[in-house]
């Protein structure tokens, strides 16, 4: 198994990195840096097939430049044995929104991978719906705007109804929230907070 990880810079004005460590496949494996991407203050990374072409792409969340927008970016894998990557923004979450965490899951059960993000400074859990095209576009919607200092998110089917729900941690009030997806496997997702 390979590893993809964010590496924040020591100073805000310097770039951080998203680094892909490739496993050599040995019984006692070692990893080498296979690729890296310069990113301002990366906070989180996910690996998923974002465009449905059968290979794994990389998605990163970052705090961006000082007081600037916080990008969610996906790096499209070209599918080669030694892949090349093309970066495209999924969303710019707003100046100084405090993008803290992302999850890449099929939230609306339509067969493509969507993004959920925790935005610390705006107390928001946001959902970016993938339209499912080979060159996807993303529709933004808020799951909640009342998670005090939104910090960490997990997407799972919490109530066994066949659709993805979201759990979030509000670091400000140290509260764990459950955002129930009230949609069905054949209807649009909609959310309530418990």
Model-derived segments and spans:
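Blade-edge motifs of beta-propeller repeat domains
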Residues: 21-40, 76-97, 129-148, 180-194
């Amino acid at each position: 198994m390979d590893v993809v990880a964010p590496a924040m810079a020591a100073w805000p004005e310097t770039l951080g990195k998203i680094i892909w460590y490739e496993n050599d496949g040995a019984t006692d494996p070692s990893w080498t840096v296979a690729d890296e991407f310069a990113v301002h203050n990366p906070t989180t990374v996910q690996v998923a097939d974002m465009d449905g072409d059968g290979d794994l792409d990389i998605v990163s969340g970052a705090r961006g430049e000082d007081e600037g927008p916080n990008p969610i970016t996906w790096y499209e894998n070209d599918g080669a044995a030694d892949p090349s990557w093309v970066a495209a923004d999924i969303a710019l979450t707003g100046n100084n929104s405090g993008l803290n965490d992302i999850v890449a899951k099929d939230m609306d059960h339509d067969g493509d991978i969507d993004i959920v993000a925790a935005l610390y400074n705006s107390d928001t859990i946001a959902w970016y719906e993938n339209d499912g095209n080979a060159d996807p576009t993303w529709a933004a919607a808020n799951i909640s705007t009342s998670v005090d200092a939104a910090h960490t998110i997990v997407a799972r089917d919490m109530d066994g109804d066949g659709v993805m729900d979201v759990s979030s941690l509000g670091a400000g009030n140290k509260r764990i929230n459950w955002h129930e997806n009230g949609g069905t496997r054949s209807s649009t997702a909609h959310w309530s907070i418990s």
